[in-house]
């Protein structure tokens, strides 16, 4: 009996360790043919907002849903690395009905980084994040749909989804889920801060 309880506990802990948010079943788009993850494709097709060392040649792309608490964790974990890297945060809308309006508010904000920090504090405080109008300009709604379609074209099943070139190997790396700062630095090939 103890072995069965231990096994079940282990399975539950493993599921929690994945640290990502998945789309609602009803909202999950049909899976198109999976394409190879490419920094160049993301740079050309996705739209988001940049934070960090904006002039850096090293860009880290992060697909996120505003309603995903794991994305908020990654937002905080990435902050110490922003002195050396440029992060482009690419909003998608798939966790719940608040996702797309909040993504639109972040994309159109005069200072998206400041609004993102405010939003993440509200979300972490259990307040659901920032208030956002459900009236979204068609071009902004299309941008979010394009970002979401690109994410799913890579076969991603949860956010945050990171795409970058490892600084040490030059290889494209990608992964789902949040990381602590040191693990994120290692994943990106950066010396720990």
What are the residue ranges of the model-derived segments?
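Conserved segment of the thioredoxin-like fold in thiol-based oxidoreductases
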Residues: 97-142
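A short, hydrophobic beta-strand/beta-hairpin element that forms part of a small beta-sheet core
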Residues: 160-174
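Short acidic-hydrophobic, aromatic-tinged amphipathic segments that line or gate anion-handling sites
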Residues: 106, 175-176
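Extracytoplasmic thiol/disulfide redox context detector
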Residues: 2-5, 12-99, 135-158, 166, ...
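Hydrophobic transmembrane alpha-helix bundles
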Residues: 124-130, 155-163
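Charge-rich, low-complexity amphipathic helices
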Residues: 90, 128-129, 173, 184
């Amino acid at each position: 009996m103890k072995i069965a309880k231990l096994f079940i506990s282990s399975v539950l802990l493993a599921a929690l360790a994945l640290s990502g948010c998945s789309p609602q079943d009803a909202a999950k788009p049909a899976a198109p043919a999976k394409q190879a993850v490419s920094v160049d494709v993301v740079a050309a097709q996705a739209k988001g907002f940049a934070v960090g060392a904006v002039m850096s040649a090293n860009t880290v792309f992060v697909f996120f849903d505003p309603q995903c608490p794991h994305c908020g964790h990654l937002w905080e974990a990435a902050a110490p690395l922003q002195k050396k890297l440029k992060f482009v945060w690419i909003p998608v809308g798939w966790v719940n009905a608040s996702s797309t309006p909040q993504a639109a508010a972040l994309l159109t904000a005069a200072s998206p980084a400041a609004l993102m920090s405010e939003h993440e504090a509200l979300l972490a405080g259990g307040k659901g994040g920032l208030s956002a109008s459900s009236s979204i300009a068609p071009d902004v709604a299309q941008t979010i749909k394009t970002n979401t379609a690109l994410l799913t074209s890579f076969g991603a099943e949860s956010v945050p989804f990171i795409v970058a070139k490892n600084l040490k190997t030059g290889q494209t790396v990608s992964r789902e889920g949040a990381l602590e700062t040191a693990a994120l630095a290692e994943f990106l090939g950066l010396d720990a801060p």
